[in-house]
Curated annotation (Swiss-Prot):
Function: Role in the defense system of the organism against microorganisms. This calcium-binding lectin binds galactose.
Domain C-type lectin: 1-120
InterPro entries the UniProt entry points to: C-type_lectin-like, C-type_lectin-like/link_sf, C-type_lectin_CS, Ca-Dep_Lectins_ImmuneDev, CTDL_fold, TC14-like_CTLD
CDD domains listed in its UniProt record: CLECT_TC14_like
Gene3D superfamilies from the UniProt entry: Mannose-Binding Protein A, subunit A
Coiled-coil portions: none
Entry GO MF terms: carbohydrate binding
Entry-linked Pfam families: Lectin_C
Ranges that cross the membrane: none
Identification of the protein by name: Lectin
Subunit description: Homodimer.
Disulfide bonds listed in the record: 21-119, 96-111
Keyword terms: Calcium, Disulfide bond, Lectin
Length: 125
């Protein structure tokens, strides 16, 4: 699968990030994060930029340890994509997922903070 990826320079909360991507005919990045080639490219870019970025995964459905990518696929808590000791508080208020600049891996955080955004669009072959 090929993807078009958009990295925003604007910061916004998680809900606004989803709207931002949708207004461009895209979605918060999710399926590209499960593609080994794409995830390497995305993480290489975010590492150079040194900012936190929203991705399309959250725990808003039930507040348990059940993170899902926005396309409905499970994001296991033992995934290699998580930063060390993360997710750390998904049963409380840390229900959304970012790429955390400290480790350049995923981190569960509150949904109201301002972060940059990564959008994706799957391209037809």
């Amino acid at each position: 699968m090929d993807y078009e990826i958009l990295f925003s320079d604007e910061t916004m909360n998680y809900a606004d990030a989803g709207t931002y991507c949708q207004s461009r005919g895209m979605a918060l990045v999710s399926s590209a994060m499960r593609d080994s080639t794409m995830v390497k490219a995305i993480l290489a870019f975010t590492e150079v930029k040194g900012h936190d970025y929203w991705v399309g995964a959250d725990n808003l459905q039930d507040g348990a340890y059940n993170f899902l990518w926005n396309d409905g696929v499970s994001l296991p808590t033992d995934s290699d994509l998580w930063s060390p000791n993360e997710p750390s508080n998904p049963q409380s208020w840390q229900l959304c997922v970012q790429i955390w600049s400290k480790y350049n891996l995923l981190d569960d955080v509150g949904c109201g903070g301002a972060r940059r955004v990564i959008c994706e669009k799957e391209l037809d072959d």
